[in-house]
């Protein structure tokens, strides 16, 4: 299938219904350990926790060798084998209520092809709207990048990170238990997150890869527990992978009506940057 054929997927839609069940929210709280503790029935779902719902549940026989569902259907069958959730832009209009049903409507908004250091790249922009009782609660755009295999990724060289005086910080130890639990929360069978020999020998990573959405959620958790204002928007961009080889640092810098967020690898480089927008 040529890139021209992929364009036929623009405008394709899907609709998924799910219960914002309490058990899944409790499992998320057990994994993330928010200071506020586990949520209760009919309480508002914390921001970004909607990523733990509306999950693709491909049958086992329809998984690719890397653990991803085979492409086609809603997502175009782009042949490049490497996939990355590269970024997102989200508006929070109303909180989802735990214990109540919801509906997510998706649409393929754009597909573009570019060239990078590893060869051709395909960018797929997916739009989502989440409704509960016919009220629009969340709007989201996700950027998914597909690429050819590249050169092996070297392990970052740890350095002593300088102290930061203008930010709230947290150090995260990304051990395999955390990565496994997050994969379970998101029903994500991609082997780079739990199968070390596969991650190293098949995809060329130095260790298990930390999920980009996990880093984004951890940054959101840091931000939301250091503000009393409502969170109305969030955006993030992945810049470099993180691995389970060493701790990484989260930083949150309040800046007027927003909070600037950053995840730094053990080498001090920015792995993911994000922004929280605050309401009145």
Swiss-Prot record:
Keywords carried by this UniProt record? Carbon dioxide fixation, Lyase
This entry's Gene Ontology molecular function terms read: (3R)-hydroxyacyl-[acyl-carrier-protein] dehydratase activity
The UniProt subunit note reads as follows: Homodimer.
Q: What is its EC number?
A: 4.2.1.153
Reactions accelerated catalytically: (3S)-citramalyl-CoA = 3-methylfumaryl-CoA + H2O
Tell me the name of the encoding gene.
Answer: meh
Activity regulation: Inhibited by 3-methylfumaryl-CoA concentrations above 0.3 mM.
Gene3D superfamilies according to UniProt: Hotdog Thioesterase (3.10.129.10)
According to its UniProt record, which protein family does this protein belong to? Answer: Belongs to the HTD2 family.
Alphabetically, which GO biological process terms does the record hold?
Answer: carbon fixation
Q: What is this protein called?
A: Mesaconyl-C(4)-CoA hydratase
Q: Which InterPro entries match?
A: HotDog_dom_sf, Mitochondrial_HTD2
* EC category: lyase
Describe the task this protein carries out: Involved in the glyoxylate assimilation cycle used to regenerate acetyl-CoA and produce pyruvate as universal precursor for biosynthesis. Catalyzes the hydration of 3-methylfumaryl-CoA (mesaconyl-C4-CoA) to (3S)-citramalyl-CoA.
Q: Where is the signal peptide?
A: none
